[in-house]
Amino acid sequence: MIDSEGFRPNVGIILANDNGQVLWAKRIGHNAWQFPQGGIHFGETPEQALYRELREEVGLLPEHVQIIAQTKGWLRYRLPHRYIRPDSDPVCIGQKQKWFLLKLTASTRHIQLNLSDPPEFDEWQWVSYWYPLGQVVNFKRDVYRKAMMELCMLLPQQQTFEKSSL
C-alpha cells in the first residue's frame, strides 16, 4: 500500500526496558542495525500493524508490552535513488511512519527473532536511548531524531536519558 505521494505507510517501534535502554536489532545478512519497523497492510490501523510487526520481528505479544506513547503525526523519509524501483506500480519513494514507544513488561526470554520466514533480524541488544542516532543508516537518521525527541518527552518520570550526540 503506497499513498498518492509515493510513501509507504509504516510503523516504527522503540521498545524500552526498565533501565531506560532500547532494543536495537541487526538486520539479517547486513551489518545494519535498526529499530523494528514494518508496513501497514490495507485495512489495518497503525496499532494493529504495531502488534503484528512486534510479533513477526521480535516475537512479542500485546501482553508483553505497554504502549507509552506514539508520535502525533506521520514522519517521512525518502529512499536513496538506488533503492527506488522505477518499474514498480505505484513507485515507492519512501516511507511515512507512525512511531510508538513501548515498555517491555515481560521477561526478555519472550524475545524471539525466528518467528517469521525469513527472519528480519539475527541479533539484538539493549542500548542507551540515544545510541541509535549515531548508528542508523543516514537516510533514516532525521526521522529517528524527530521520533525519539518527541517520544522521550512522554517517558515515565523515572526514565531519564542524556541527549548526547544529538
Curated annotation (Swiss-Prot):
Q: Where is this motif: Nudix box?
A: 38-59
Kindly state which keywords UniProt assigns to this record, in alphabetical order: Hydrolase
Q: What class does this enzyme belong to in the EC scheme?
A: hydrolase
Q: What is its EC number?
A: 3.6.1.-
| Pfam families listed in its UniProt record | NUDIX (PF00293)
- Domain named Nudix hydrolase: which ranges? 6-149
Matching entries from InterPro entries are given as: Nudix_hydrolase, NUDIX_hydrolase-like_dom_sf, NUDIX_hydrolase_CS, NUDIX_hydrolase_dom, RppH
* Keyword hit for Magnesium: no
SUPFAM superfamilies to which the protein is assigned, alphabetical: Nudix
The cofactor named in the record is: a divalent metal cation
GO molecular function terms attached to this record: pyrophosphatase activity
Enumerate the PROSITE patterns for this protein: NUDIX (PS51462), NUDIX_BOX (PS00893)
Q: Which PANTHER family would you find in this protein's record? A: ADP-RIBOSE PYROPHOSPHATASE (PTHR43736), DIHYDRONEOPTERIN TRIPHOSPHATE DIPHOSPHATASE (PTHR43736:SF1)
This molecule's function is given as: Accelerates the degradation of transcripts by removing pyrophosphate from the 5'-end of triphosphorylated RNA, leading to a more labile monophosphorylated state that can stimulate subsequent ribonuclease cleavage.
Family the entry assigns? Belongs to the Nudix hydrolase family. RppH subfamily.
HAMAP family, per this entry? Answer: Nudix_RppH
Report the protein name in the record. Answer: RNA pyrophosphohydrolase
